Amino acid sequence: MTYSVDKVRADFPVLSREVNGLPLAYLDSAASAQKPSQVIDAEAEFYRHGYAAVHRGIHTLSAQATEKMESVRKRASLFINARSAEELVFVRGTTEGINLVANSWGNSNVRAGDNIIISQMEHHANIVPWQMLCARVGAELRVIPLNPDGTLQLEMLPNLFDEKTRLLAITHVSNVLGTENPLAEMITLAHQHGAKVLVDGAQAVMHHPVDVQALDCDFYVFSGHKLYGPTGIGILYVKEALLQEMPPWEGGGSMIATVSLSEGTTWTKAPWRFEAGTPNTGGIIGLGAALEYVSALGLNNIAEYEQNLMHYALSQLESVPDLTLYGPQNRLGVIAFNLGKHHAYDVGSFLDNYGIAVRTGHHCAMPLMAYYNVPAMCRASLAMYNTHEEVDRLVTGLQRIHRLLG
């Protein structure tokens, strides 16, 4: 299949709009990606003609909605090559998925004196839940330090493991630096020390294929909204043996087998015991449409196109005076930068005047900002619908800002 970015862009209605009188150049997909018509229409069609509460309903609409929901679980399992659809839990997003693991598996398996390993490049969603768990139980949080080029000091990792290490929680791809971590060797090392591994895949699954069986990770979590799907829906993968042992962390409808005021409550089996309450069925339907859309394009095709675009962007940005880039040469999805001594917010505001949308701030990665000794960065992210012309506009915009501000 020949990849046509023009055909892809035609599926995204928002990309035809203007901002400040100029065509929108949306370079903020790492924060949240735009949605194709196929996703918008699938969710709207469900609410127009197919909506009902799922599970236990005897009527046709409920049965059909349940079938559609569970078919998305199956599609998602194929998308990441899980052994079974029953290894996947629907969550609100990556953040909830990590908190679920921390509050269910973590509360049951991490004790005083144990330790958890994370890295200095993590998103707050893969830091704060582990800080909270360690504070609750008296465990230690250990950190893999960064190199200046945005890679991890992996030579330090063996020294962080010991017989008390219970978990390695690591990002697949940094949301700021674009660094893709060498998961295979990290996971092997963790398992050699008897530790489990959680992978934050929020910035990976849209850029290339992910195979959780090949990785052999114990947990893998990602969000739908960065994968061209709706907000408020994501996937937590857990190896089946682990998932069946984990207790629920939220109580309510749908996650019970029996409820008795005198004899207490028993839980239904996983994954449904982790899905208390009425689910975001519309979001699940939209996620299914997003998975179908991306799969039809082919993740390998997307990866090839995006990597060519990334190489072009990095080469063109070399022409911008006083531009500092953060992260390795080989990266996925994002380019973080600062322009001279100007605050990222000012640079981002000027770019917005030119119709260019980038993200500014600490990117939910304050420890990483502290490492580079900056309060904030600009971040341009490249997705499957971005073009070489949009990269040229970014470069021209930065050159113009440099001339204006000095």
Curated annotation (Swiss-Prot):
Cofactor: pyridoxal 5'-phosphate
Modified sites of kind N6-(pyridoxal phosphate)lysine: 226
Pathway linked to the protein: Cofactor biosynthesis; iron-sulfur cluster biosynthesis
A Pfam family that the UniProt record links to this protein: Aminotran_5
Matches recorded under CDD domains: SufS_like
EC number: 2.8.1.7, 4.4.1.16
Functional summary from the UniProt entry: Cysteine desulfurases mobilize the sulfur from L-cysteine to yield L-alanine, an essential step in sulfur metabolism for biosynthesis of a variety of sulfur-containing biomolecules. Component of the suf operon, which is activated and required under specific conditions such as oxidative stress and iron limitation. Acts as a potent selenocysteine lyase in vitro, that mobilizes selenium from L-selenocysteine. Selenocysteine lyase activity is however unsure in vivo.
Protein known as: Cysteine desulfurase
Natural source organism: Escherichia coli O7:K1 (strain IAI39 / ExPEC)
